[in-house]
């Protein structure tokens, strides 16, 4: 292919235009989204995933740590099996041994644990295609993590500033346990109110009346009422 191209142009002298962005790093997802309006669109979560690939987190060898790790590995295995993709650098055995994931993978994994615990809002999600499912899980995971760590949803690019919290012993277990607890409280509160009558329907709950961000706002209200996150632990 390169030899054919060289018959028509000199690749050594080819001028390739580029745009240099000198602003804050946390604004890159918005900048990229604006530049990419005419092409194949990537969500801001896909942009953040690429941007955060080097922000590593070591998960504890605990029930919650292992659940997060399984979600990350399972996601990649499904992408390989369902889309016939090759994922650069993915080695399931190596991940099991190191217990290392990155910040973006944490957000996805906690998002999937949350939607599984919140059937009243996202019970229909697992009947949808992989792309739609991943989009919703990303929204839930990234925004919930931002809420828990005191980062404005409009400034998700600042989440890496909180990485030092994840290196504090016991923090990840405490964070995951308390996040899931609040979502289970919300699930119990809305379960009877949104339950559809009859047993014949495949849908258990009337989910159309509550948008994703509305459900996330319920979590934000409870979280800020019950918890304060600092560099040492989560205070209740």
Regions found by a protein language model. Give the residues of each.
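Conserved small/polar residues in nucleotide/adenosyl-binding loops
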Residues: 234-236
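C-terminal solvent-exposed extensions
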Residues: 119-160
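Structured, charged N-terminal subsegments at the starts of enzyme catalytic cores
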Residues: 146, 150-207, 214, 223
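Short glycine/serine- and small hydrophobic-enriched flexible loop segments
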Residues: 220-226
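Amphipathic alpha-helical interaction segments
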Residues: 30, 138-142, 213, 217
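Polar/charged alpha-helical tracts
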Residues: 3, 67-81, 97, 131, ...
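Serine/threonine-rich low-complexity intrinsically disordered regions
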Residues: 10-12, 62, 102, 129-132, ...
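Basic- and aromatic-enriched surface patches that contact anionic nucleotides/nucleic acids
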Residues: 1-123, 206-209, 218-220, 231
């Amino acid at each position: 292919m390169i030899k054919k191209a060289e018959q028509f142009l000199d690749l050594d002298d080819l001028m390739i235009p580029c745009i240099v962005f000198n602003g804050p790093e946390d604004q890159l997802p918005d900048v990229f989204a604006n530049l990419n309006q005419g092409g194949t669109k990537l969500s801001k979560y896909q942009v953040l995933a690429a941007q955060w690939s080097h922000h590593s987190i070591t998960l504890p060898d605990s029930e919650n740590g292992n659940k997060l790790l399984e979600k990350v590995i399972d996601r990649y295995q499904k992408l390989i099996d369902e889309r016939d993709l090759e994922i650069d650098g993915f080695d399931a055995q190596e991940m099991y041994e190191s217990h290392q994931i990155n910040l973006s993978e944490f957000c996805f994994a906690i998002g999937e644990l949350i939607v599984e615990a919140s059937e009243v809002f996202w019970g229909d999600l697992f009947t949808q295609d992989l792309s739609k499912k991943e989009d919703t899980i990303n929204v839930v995971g990234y925004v919930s993590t931002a809420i828990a760590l005191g980062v404005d949803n409009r400034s998700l690019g600042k989440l890496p500033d909180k990485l030092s919290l994840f290196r504090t012993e016991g923090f990840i277990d405490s964070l995951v346990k308390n996040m899931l607890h609040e979502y289970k409280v919300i699930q119990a509160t809305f379960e009877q109110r949104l339950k559809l009558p009859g047993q014949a329907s495949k849908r258990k709950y009337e989910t159309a009346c509550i948008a994703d961000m509305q459900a996330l706002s319920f979590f934000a209200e409870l979280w800020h009422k019950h918890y304060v996150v600092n560099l040492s632990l989560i205070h209740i």
